[in-house]
């Protein structure tokens, strides 16, 4: 990032890497603070426009870099494009300068991305729905062979047998509040504890609920016939399935 910033300054772009009020990275929050995004900086003085741009820097392998050059950010890396859109929306700027470096050859690629207000608002709304939802979002596709699912980081959780890590967000007792805090129905400090109870809807599809109460859920593993009782022992009984 330092080299990229130096290169931008060398061609006359004024770059702010830190928030002048805090001295830290420029950061924005939504959803009461549950959702946050940081910028790599803000630049002003690009030859195409004097208006300030958010800055987003990425390094890529050869394959991803070639796709970026050929297709552009939105088509080759839609998740990066979405990040740029949210950054512009939260910072109230209309342009982003997206910069990528091929980590194998040091070749560079730059692209100006324009704010799409409707898309940006939709992305933030989607984040809010996920943050405050009591249940995990539905699968993008029911067919695990779909290409979007095959390349998703959560494929093993969504379509396979992997169980998410033990955390307050995967616990039935915990609720994210609108003011950015968390509430535990057990009256505990919001940190992983011995009373963790998985939200049943995030368990593997071969786990069928056969009994449940306020502080326990029993599952039958359809593959083995084993009955597993989740009652404050999530880490112990599911540890092997989290890997």
Where are these predicted regions, by residue range?
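Generic beta-sheet signal
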Residues: 18, 57, 99-101
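Short, solvent-exposed aromatic-acidic interface loops
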Residues: 59-62, 103
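Metal-dependent nuclease catalytic cores that hydrolyze phosphodiester bonds in DNA/RNA
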Residues: 1-54, 61-63, 68-71, 194-197, ...
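Metal-dependent nuclease catalytic regions and adjoining charged, substrate-binding loops involved
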Residues: 67-81, 86-187, 192-243
């Amino acid at each position: 990032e330092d080299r990229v910033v130096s290169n931008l300054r060398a061609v006359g772009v004024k770059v702010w890497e830190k928030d002048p009020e805090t001295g830290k990275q420029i950061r924005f929050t939504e959803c009461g603070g549950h959702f946050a995004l940081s910028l790599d900086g803000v630049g002003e003085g690009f030859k195409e426009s004097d208006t300030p741009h958010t800055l987003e820097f990425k390094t890529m392998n050869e394959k991803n870099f070639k796709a970026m050059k050929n297709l552009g950010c939105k088509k080759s890396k839609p998740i990066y494009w979405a990040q740029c859109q949210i950054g512009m929306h939260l910072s109230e700027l209309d342009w982003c300068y997206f910069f990528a470096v091929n980590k194998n050859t040091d070749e560079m690629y730059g692209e100006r991305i324009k704010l799409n207000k409707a898309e940006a608002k939709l992305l933030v709304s989607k984040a809010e729905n996920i943050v405050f939802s009591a249940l995990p979002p539905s699968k993008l596709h029911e067919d695990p062979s779909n290409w979007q699912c095959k390349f998703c980081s959560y494929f093993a959780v969504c379509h396979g047998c992997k169980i998410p890590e033990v955390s307050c967000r995967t616990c039935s007792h915990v609720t994210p509040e609108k003011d950015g805090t968390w509430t535990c129905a057990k009256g505990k400090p919001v940190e992983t504890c011995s009373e963790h109870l998985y939200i049943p809807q995030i368990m593997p599809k071969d786990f069928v609920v056969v009994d449940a109460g306020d502080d326990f859920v029993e599952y039958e593993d359809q593959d083995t016939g084993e009955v597993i009782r989740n009652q404050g022992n999530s880490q112990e009984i599911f540890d092997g399935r989290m890997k």
